[in-house]
Amino acid sequence: MTGVDEILNYKRNPDDDYYALLGCDENSTVEQITAEYKVLALQYHPDKNDGDKEAEAKFQQLKEAKETLCEPSKRALYDKWRQSGIAMGFKQWLGMKDHVQQSMHWSKPNTKDRMLEGEPGKPSGPSSLGPSNPGARRASEGGAALWGRWGAGNQEPPSEVISKFRNYEI
């Protein structure tokens, strides 16, 4: 099967979802991931399941998932692959990541809804520290961060034309 056929006929393997494999969420901390791993590793460890090939394979998957999710650089790559929705496995994507990422510059990362809603009409989070105009919002919230990191400083606001251009309104 060629690489293109593999991509076109790709069916996502549930074992590729490291978060589900470990019983974690994408917002889990390294400590939470490690704790979940320890519980499952004890259950599937080859010493406790002598001769059980399935338990040994599961243990190897758990180990790989933990190693990937506990190292920040690997986790960032894994999350990028997971959110891309691209039709290939994580290992295949890793082998081609430099080529694939060149064509993913347009993709928008999936973000979860915020747990706490601010007051209606009032922004919440880091954007509430700076100006509340659309140009000061993060790009993921429908605006470009034109005011620098937190909107502090003595910067003058950009012209209306520049704001519209940067927000893809013209």
From Swiss-Prot:
Chaperone keyword on record: yes
Domain J positions: 17-82
Keywords carried by this UniProt record: Chaperone
Entry-linked Pfam families: DnaJ
Biased composition (Low complexity): 121-135, 142-153
Region spans: Disordered: 101-170
Gene Ontology cellular-component terms listed: cytoplasm
InterPro entries per record: DnaJ_domain, J_dom_sf, JDP1-like
SMART domains on file: DnaJ
UniProt protein name: J domain-containing protein
Organism whose genome encodes this protein: Manduca sexta (Tobacco hawkmoth)
Organismal lineage: Eukaryota, Metazoa, Ecdysozoa, Arthropoda, Hexapoda
Gene: jdp
